[in-house]
A protein has these predicted regions:
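Generic structural signal for small/hydrophobic residues in well-ordered secondary structure
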Residues: 21-22, 44, 62, 82, ...
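Active-site region of PLP-dependent enzymes
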Residues: 163-169, 176-286
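Active-site phosphate-binding strand-loop segment of PLP-dependent enzymes
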Residues: 111-192, 197-205
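Aromatic/hydrophobic pocket-lining residues that form π-stacking "cages" and hydrophobic walls in ligand
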Residues: 92, 145, 209
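Conserved PLP-binding active-site segment in aminotransferase class I/II-type PLP enzymes
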Residues: 1-77, 98, 150, 273
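Conserved PLP-anchoring active-site segment centered on the Schiff-base-forming lysine
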Residues: 67-123
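Hydrophobic/aromatic ligand-binding patch that stacks against planar heteroaromatic rings
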Residues: 94-96, 148, 172, 249
Length: 286
């Protein structure tokens, strides 16, 4: 019997609308940082309620910036600990190691998110942050994790790679964390080719992340071009940074996808409920 495989990880694009958006970038002659990246940052803030939103080239870059900025601004030392989970993509824990910090693995609960008892067992005087991974868009016991961390002065980094559109009691996740990082990679629920958004609660953290993501340069090309008057050739390189900025082509795709995100997530919930219904009566499946 021939069986047609069900492809789980194929991005769904509104092709004509996406091509029109990309064409707008090309006709304007601005495909890099600025223009559409400014638009998607504003739209993302409006959609989620986050205070700051910085469009970057991947969730991985955003996680690295999140940890790098918090380490610099809060005076963390090499070897300080970040409680995390092994049940995640490697980017989550690579970012911890990039910054000379130590990942401490906690177990997961029935929601596949960090288990509270396991978390409490692993908190030490060297714990500086908890990396909460909302795998599959699940929130697990995220609110309890927040409470535990707040009462102990521990930072909360939300790896929200799967959480575009995730809400708790009607409120989008992200604003409550010290920093939340979303993925817009091709197989995520808000697909581009690859990009992401890093969202700091603190304005100074956001400002540092923006400099670091543009090679430590004080003003990006878009600011120097559209700041009034002639192009500004003079700028400072205040610190050693990275090339993590997003671009307008990816932002154009994200702006289109964002318009359909809630509808797409509703369809995912419908399919999930169908699986629950059809598999629920089978012994051994919970």
């Amino acid at each position: 019997m021939n069986r047609t495989p069900i492809q789980l990880f194929v991005p769904h694009f509104r092709i004509d609308e996406s091509l029109d958006a990309v064409r707008t970038c090309m006709e304007r002659g601005w495909t890099g940082l600025g223009f559409m990246t400014v638009d998607i940052e504003q739209k993302w803030k409006e959609y989620t309620g986050v205070k700051n939103a910085h469009f970057v080239n991947s969730n991985t870059a955003g996680l690295h910036l999140a940890l790098d900025v918090l380490k610099r601004r809060r005076g963390w030392a090499d070897g300080d600990e970040v409680i995390t989970t092994a049940l995640t993509f490697v980017s989550t824990n690579h970012a911890i190691l990039y910054c000379g910090l130590t990942p401490v693995f906690a177990d997961v609960d029935e929601y596949l998110c960090i288990d509270l008892a396991s978390l409490l067992e692993r908190i030490t005087d060297k714990t500086r942050a908890v990396m909460f991974v909302g795998i599959g868009g699940n929130v697990g016991r995220y609110l309890e994790v927040l409470e535990i961390c707040r009462s102990r002065g521990i930072a909360v980094i939300l790896d929200a790679a799967h959480m575009a559109g995730t809400r708790i009691d009607g409120h989008h996740v992200g604003p409550e964390a010290d920093v939340a990082v979303f993925s817009f990679q091709a197989v995520k629920n808000l697909p581009t080719a690859d990009s992401g958004m890093v969202c700091f609660a603190d304005d100074a953290d956001d400002a540092l992340a923006r400099r670091l993501s543009w090679l430590g340069i004080s003003k990006d090309t878009y600011e120097r071009t559209h700041g009034g008057g002639a192009y500004k050739w003079m700028y400072d390189v205040d610190e050693l940074g990275y090339k993590y900025n997003g671009n307008s082509i990816m932002a154009a795709l994200a702006l289109v996808a964002l318009k359909y995100l809630d509808d797409d997530n509703a369809e995912r919930r419908r399919i999930s409920a169908l699986y629950d219904s059809l598999l629920g009566g089978i012994d051994g499946i919970e």
